[in-house]
Amino acid sequence: MPTIQQLIRLGRSVKASKTASPALEKCPQKRGVCTRVYTTTPKKPNSALRKVARVRLSNKIEVTAYIPGEGHNLQEHSIVLIRGGRVKDLPGVRYHIVRGSLDTSGVADRKQSRSKYGAKQPKAGVPAPVKGKGKR
């Protein structure tokens, strides 16, 4: 516990906050090139094959990024846009690939939350399937 005189002389030191996505270097997104596209399994208790890509960013840092949505067209040497945001059940995955930008296609046949997956608006002439009125 400092004395009042010590506080007058030195003041309090402010702790610097640590960023959750250091490879972005305070940028909202960064461009990168896929070096490897593969699937990995999540931590317990979940079970799946999650699609991830190893990406070398424009600042020469290599990170692991998650590919959201169903199906993708990414392969080695694809140019992608990376944003922050971790995947809770994949250790070491702290970035997401932005769908619908650069070489990444949007999710096909996506009706809801389209902006998050880079999907275009469906054509007006085609009626949307009604929820809950399927075959029984």
From Swiss-Prot:
Keywords: Methylation, Ribonucleoprotein, Ribosomal protein, RNA-binding, rRNA-binding, tRNA-binding. One of its GO terms (cellular component) is small ribosomal subunit. GO terms for biological process: translation. It comes from the Bacteria. One of its GO terms (molecular function) is tRNA binding. The modification 3-methylthioaspartic acid is found at D89. Pfam families: Ribosom_S12_S23 (PF00164). InterPro entries: NA-bd_OB-fold, Ribosomal_uS12, Ribosomal_uS12_bac. Transmembrane segments: none annotated. Residues 101-136 are annotated as: Disordered. With S4 and S5 plays an important role in translational accuracy. Belongs to the universal ribosomal protein uS12 family. Part of the 30S ribosomal subunit. Contacts proteins S8 and S17. May interact with IF1 in the 30S initiation complex. HAMAP family: Ribosomal_uS12_B (MF_00403_B). This is Small ribosomal subunit protein uS12. The gene is rpsL.
